[in-house]
A protein has these predicted regions:
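Polytopic transmembrane helical bundles with strong interfacial aromatic enrichment
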Residues: 1-129
Length: 129
């Protein structure tokens, strides 16, 4: 039962990530003007990262409870750490670079965040197969 819950929660994180990446973000930038799109993205991303981080931490706790400390544990640990790094280190830098019109640094740091997001989705898919 608890193991099944961890599978559902892992699936939920992947679903949230896919929905956010392929529905929310594109719709925001094609619907809102640039200023409002920026404001919206800056408000929603912390929730996106923290909700996913919270769910992953619950999965980690279930793995610990089940003494499931193999590759799956380390994958979800890596995913969790990447959510924390993205939210608490990378996002403030991305916002700073955008605000200061440092386009090269903004594009590079944004690219890193996209790569991290993609890696997390791959890790989640590996957990589910």
């Amino acid at each position: 039962m608890i193991e099944q819950v961890s599978i559902y929660l892992t699936s939920m994180v992947l679903g949230i990530m896919l929905f956010f990446s392929f529905v929310i973000a594109p719709v925001v930038f094609t619907t809102l003007d640039e200023d409002n799109a920026r404001k919206f993205i800056r408000r929603i991303f912390p929730y996106y990262y923290n909700v996913n981080l919270g769910i992953c931490l619950i999965v980690l706790l279930t793995f610990i409870f089940l003494s499931k400390l193999g590759i799956d544990f380390y994958l979800i640990l890596a995913i969790s750490l990447l959510f924390a790094v993205s939210n608490y280190l990378l996002m403030p830098l991305i916002n700073k670079y955008r605000d200061e019109s440092q386009d090269k640094k903004f594009k590079y740091s944004h690219f890193i965040s996209v790569v991290i997001n993609f890696v997390q989705m791959i890790f989640l898919a590996l957990l589910l197969i």
